[in-house]
Amino acid sequence: MADPSTPNATLGALAATYLAPWRTAGVSQKQVDAAHLHWADYRDAQWGGAVPLGTSRNRLLRVNILGGRLYYVSCVGQRSTARKVRQRAILALIRATLAVHELPDVDLVLSLSDRPTVPRHAVMDGSPPLVFGYVTTAWHWSVPFPYATFEPQRWAPLYRQLGHHPALEVRKPQAVWRGSCNSLCDMLKGMRSGGSGGASGGASGADQSGGCSIDLLDRLRLLRHAARCPELTDVGLTKEHVHCRGFPARAPLTLREHAQFAYLIHVDGNGFSGRLEELLSLGGVVLKEESPFGSWYYPLLRAHEHVVPLARNLSTLCDSLRALREEPRRAATLAAAAQRFATAYLAPERVIGYVAALVRGYATLQRFRPRRHPMAKEWAGAETMVSRPTAATTTDATLHSASSGRASGFPFSMALHTGGSNSGHFCPPADVSCCKRHPRACRRRRGTR
């Protein structure tokens, strides 16, 4: 499907493929209303947090586009800081798409979770709900929507750094990873895995840490395998965790600091990890764990061309790194291909074009006239913005500041991934509850440590 000479056509075809299951029957107003209220929670026991069918504790983000104006019904509570940031990012991306493309009227629902919420086995009547989300798997119904990383004022300055990072041959010849010990085990609350949905290729279920199956601890496996070849890796947690005992915390790294390493590692967390697009923009060789989770652009990625695949249990990490060191020409080819991929398909205008194709395709499936939801309010973007970055401020220093989660003239969603290093939270002004839970984040905002 991937044809770098026609990226817009490729992305349009990709959007159509995702919407194909609903092409014949379409989508009714009743289905949209039901999806909004009943498909926001996880229903996979083997991945934690299973909610019985017919019940729900949450609702999805409801989006109405009417006459070129954007309305929404929030899906976050007062204490849901991370979800609030994701919601703002999604709305900002849709707003940016409306600024460039004329879009039809739609009424849709979108999940902000890092795992899909509609298992195929749970929908047996042939009319699955159409839920947009960050992530999809072979076992779920989901239409992939760009992750919060692609919020326009966050992604644009990162993307503009393409081609401006150090050459591969002058970088540290090691593989870097920083992050937390987030895992599906956090959702299981200490229970062992009861299924095979996301636990392929792992070690024995008896090999546990913190009472949780090793099959669900991708990041613990990474730490253990990296410890087998310390001369090839610079891998560490930014915070100690019960599931990763024995591995002390290490200093987080900004994206600029990640770009000093030749090899960049990507692994799962609580589910899907939205860090891959950041790594693809850094000009290094990306090593990606085989994963059941997919993002919107993953079908266009080719193993051994754009990324180096790692076994699901990460047992091939050290051997893969040794081979890359021994074949610098192949490593350079891989790094260049990853950069070309990002240029072709992840440019801000391409992301916006993909969103436009999704919305237009979805509109043709609607078997009803979209109307404004009674609880919906208009979103103009002011609640997200601090100030718009200028060309003069979009420098390496700006990238460094944005990546470390500090205020730098960008929207608060800039702190979502803290430069791919999980270095902490960032609280909006006057958010007292956030400051109480994350006092260090508020100290950063005030310019103190």
Give residue spans per PLM region:
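Long, low-complexity intrinsically disordered regions of secretory-pathway proteins
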Residues: 197-204, 398-408, 448-449
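Secretory-pathway glycan-assembly enzymes, especially type II membrane glycosyltransferases
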Residues: 1-247, 252-253, 409-412, 424-428, ...
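General helical structural elements
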Residues: 223, 392, 441-449
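Catalytic binding pocket for nucleotide-activated donors in carbohydrate/polymer assembly enzymes
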Residues: 252-385, 389-391, 405, 409-439, ...
